[in-house]
């Protein structure tokens, strides 16, 4: 069946990682949601919740300039997760980097969890 993850597929993936020394990881919000960081576009994401203004408006430069207090209120309440800790994905990626297999992490995340897990070459 197409798209089904089987042990054979997982074993192939593990084998690819074991035999690779030039891995670049591309990631986004899904990596940090397990750590309690909200995403934007899922059913429960910030873009699907109801606010006085749409989140994409609140997070714009012009909104920040015109409504600084409202911007910071949204940012503090919805985007800061000061207690968030790296999850297994962050930790394993850091381990791959330390082992010399992972060369870089390219991410849209700005939560610092990759760095907190020990990754050094993170491009946000």
State each model region's role.
Residues 1-124:
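Conserved catalytic core of sirtuin-type NAD+-dependent deacylases
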